[in-house]
């Protein structure tokens, strides 16, 4: 197991910055999208949970290690947020791709339950995959900074995709069933509580976000 260290930088303010960075790709567009099977506003957080669970499963992180990874994810998002503010979203994404592409054997593609047929479904898929790609590239930067190899990064990205497929499978029993099960898996893997908000649409899905 790699030494993740015991120190963690303060994250209270940074949590909001991370959420904003992810949500640049998942901005809500009105009532038409409100009750989708998979809420775009939650995609970035779901993929983040998938990523942390993958890291814990593959690299046997303890709680301090998990918190270190989460703090590093937030720090990477700060760089992206700063570049977005200075250069604009397109340039910031281009810079992120350039930094991460050499460490990725292939692009990260978020799995789908079924291919969209309607235009709004295609738009939703595009934006959901954009959110997933953003989180995955933050994750790649974290792994690279911690000294993991390209092969280990590829294995972790596959694990994230597998975790998201499981989330989609759970969602067949209902969207909130999937969210609860994802939160349970996160708690079991990390020992960190992940509350689920009871009122759909009023708040973020996960009461405690990374």
Where are these regions (language model features)?
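Short amphipathic alpha-helical surface patches that serve as generic macromolecular interface elements
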Residues: 136, 154-157
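Intrinsic disorder/low-complexity detector
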Residues: 2-55, 79-144, 173-210
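Amphipathic alpha-helical segments that form the core helices of the histone-fold
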Residues: 69-80, 156-168
């Amino acid at each position: 197991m790699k030494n993740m260290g015991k120190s963690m930088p303060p994250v209270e303010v940074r949590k909001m910055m991370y959420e904003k960075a992810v949500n640049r790709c998942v901005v809500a567009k009105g009532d038409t999208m409100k009750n989708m099977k998979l809420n775009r506003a939650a995609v970035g957080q779901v993929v983040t949970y998938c990523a942390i669970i993958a890291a814990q499963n593959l690299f046997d992180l303890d709680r301090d290690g998990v918190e270190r990874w989460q703090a590093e994810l937030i720090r990477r998002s700060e760089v992206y947020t700063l570049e977005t503010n200075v250069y604009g979203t397109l340039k910031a994404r281009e810079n992120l791709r350039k930094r991460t592409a050499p460490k990725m054997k292939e692009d990260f593609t978020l799995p789908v339950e079924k291919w969209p047929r309607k235009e709004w479904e295609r738009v939703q898929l595009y934006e959901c995959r954009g959110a997933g790609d953003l989180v995955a590239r933050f994750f790649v930067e974290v792994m690279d900074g911690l000294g993991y190899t390209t092969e280990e990064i590829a294995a972790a990205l596959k694990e994230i995709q597998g975790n998201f497929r499981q989330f989609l499978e759970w969602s067949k029993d209902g969207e909130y069933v999937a969210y609860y099960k994802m939160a349970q898996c996160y708690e079991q893997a990390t020992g960190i509580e992940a509350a689920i908000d009871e009122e759909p649409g009023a708040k973020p899905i996960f009461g405690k976000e990374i």
